[in-house]
Amino acid sequence: MRFRIITLSCATLFLAMPVYPYGALGHETVGAIADMKLAGTPTGAQVTKLLDGITLARASVLADEIKGWDRLKKDQPKPIILKDQPQLQEQLVAFWNANPPTKAKGSDAPTHKEFHYTDVPAVDGSKYVKGNLGTEPYDIVQMIPFCVRVLAGEEPETNDRKITKPVALILLAHYVGDIHQPLHVGNAYFSSAGNLVNPSKGGKSFPDHGGNGFNIILADEKNAKSDAQGESKSGAKSSGKKSSKSKGNNLHSFWDTDAVVEALNQAEKKIESQPKHKGKATDEEVIAWLANAEPVEWKAKAKSPPTDWAQQWANEILPMSTQAHERLEFTNVTIKSESASGDATEKKMPDGISYTEWSGQRTQEELHKAGWRLAEIIEASLNTKNSQAQKPNSKK
């Protein structure tokens, strides 16, 4: 099944063709699950009011869409991405201006691009500890609670980051998805010789920036290449099949896109295997299934405030990030501009599960939890005493 971008209006799902490249599909899946969880609730009504009618599914991709403004100067007009919500558009422009794509000389203002990730070393036993290697004052683990505090009325909407309550909702809809993508949290580090290292043990090391510098080579692609070489030598016709899924893909893009498609295809097959189900599963059925079936171990630690949840989620996904690297062999590693790049080739694993199948299984689990967690963190943030005491500002 070819999944299309999914949006949700109140309790009714409808489809729209994608207009942007956990790519948009993953983010909108998370947002659509949360939309369904909150539909018909007082919190859902607050979300609709704050977002001027747009859904969390639509809101979930806006933090990536504004990256399209990054080529523009601060004083240049920004393309309209919310033509029917001019106040939201204005607030997003103010947010972009306060957190420019590049740091101005002598400025302490962070860039909004830093808010989407953290670079904790992807090694066994690794934990997110503020101030340690790979963390930043405005990384994703810090920005999620910042948005929570804005929604809860504990952080004024006049803050230096220009994050109003509507913008906080937009950012949460995106960041909660990002923090459930393993390469947005864990980072591989390499020695000058191109070997994977644990940077905490000392010595100079170079990050892979979430896999963006590595081209992923899956087993079927590797076999197809070998078959093609055999054909050229023998003249015989190759029987090897080459998958086009990850051709030319870097490792980060694989997790943003291919793993999501695999995850949703696996979900579709589970639905179709149910005794009473007839025909192909629809996109709406997949979202409804994920929204209605409670994920395993998705709840936060008992009595922990929502401002602590991002760190819990980061620590939960770090082992997955480590495994995402351990299932690959890194070769042809080069160091340039303090960053590592090269090839990442799928290993044959003892469990017999391919990298694509394994990543799809894990991504389905993470998308599922992320959708439920997005709904819960919004509900917890908007229903504190402070948030109830303040009227939401529709325009700043």
For the regions a protein language model found, what residue spans apply to each?
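Bacterial N-terminal signal peptides that target proteins for export
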Residues: 1-7
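A broad, structure-centric signal for solvent-exposed, well-ordered loop/edge residues
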Residues: 7-8, 124
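N-terminal signal peptide c-region/cleavage motif recognized by signal peptidases
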Residues: 16-18
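Residue-level micro-sites within transmembrane alpha helices that shape
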Residues: 3, 179-180
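N-terminal, motif-rich segments that launch catalysis or mediate targeting to/interaction with membranes
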Residues: 20-175, 182-350, 354-368, 372-396
